[in-house]
């Protein structure tokens, strides 16, 4: 495993973003681990998260300009911190996010920040894709921007579990919309990380058992 992936998983665990136990996903599945960017609470943590997203962005896209979109609410801080981290790397990208409820006074509208123009490409930054519902909601919101194309989606973790079909939710989104979905790490990276310490044996077994039932087929 690459060193930055190990560092990222350790960061998620230390920050309380990655938890092990008994949880219920939006899909209704009982899951043995949970990922929640809402547990990032300090400036140091969000700055570090932004640097990991920026590294992933530069590896996958390079210094190709685009506009970062962070869906409310968790995606907002990810978009802002990623834009700052990219600026530190010499790539100055604009960002924007949506309001949950449209504002009918002042500047008004659904979006806050830079509003992409016709022909510009948007990169969506999210914490995780479980069933793909949030991405589909984002696509509906962004469809009101004429001539704007979504180029990619970046998330923290690919859970590698079934979506609506035998494919993963990420693969389903890619197939449905025609753009790539990238993750900093996937669940098998997490398993490899956990296996380095014998005290994690129970969590490793539970995750493997879960994937044996709910794991997606590779494409």
Positions of PLM-derived features:
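PRPP-associated nucleotide enzymes
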Residues: 1-125, 133-219
């Amino acid at each position: 495993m690459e060193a930055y992936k190990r560092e990222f998983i350790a960061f998620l665990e230390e920050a309380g973003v990655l938890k092990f136990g008994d949880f219920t996903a939006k899909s209704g599945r009982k899951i043995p681990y949970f990922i929640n960017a809402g547990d990032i609470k300090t400036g140091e943590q969000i700055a570090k998260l932004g640097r990991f997203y920026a590294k992933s962005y530069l590896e996958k896209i390079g210094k190709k300009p685009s506009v970062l979109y962070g869906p409310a609410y968790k995606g907002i801080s990810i978009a802002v911190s990623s834009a700052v981290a990219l600026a530190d790397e010499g790539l100055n990208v604009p960002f924007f996010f949506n309001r949950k409820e449209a504002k009918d006074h002042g500047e008004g509208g659904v979006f806050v920040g830079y509003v992409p123009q016709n022909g510009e490409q948007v990169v969506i930054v999210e914490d995780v894709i479980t069933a793909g519902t949030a991405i589909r909601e984002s696509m509906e919101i962004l469809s009101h921007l004429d001539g704007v194309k979504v180029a990619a989606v970046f998330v923290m973790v690919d859970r590698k579990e079934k979506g609506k079909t035998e494919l993963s939710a990420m693969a389903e989104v890619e197939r449905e919309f025609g753009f790539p979905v990238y993750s900093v790490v996937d669940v098998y990276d997490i398993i490899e990380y956990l296996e380095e310490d014998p005290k994690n044996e129970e969590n490793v077994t539970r995750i493997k058992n879960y994937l044996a039932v709910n794991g997606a087929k590779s494409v």
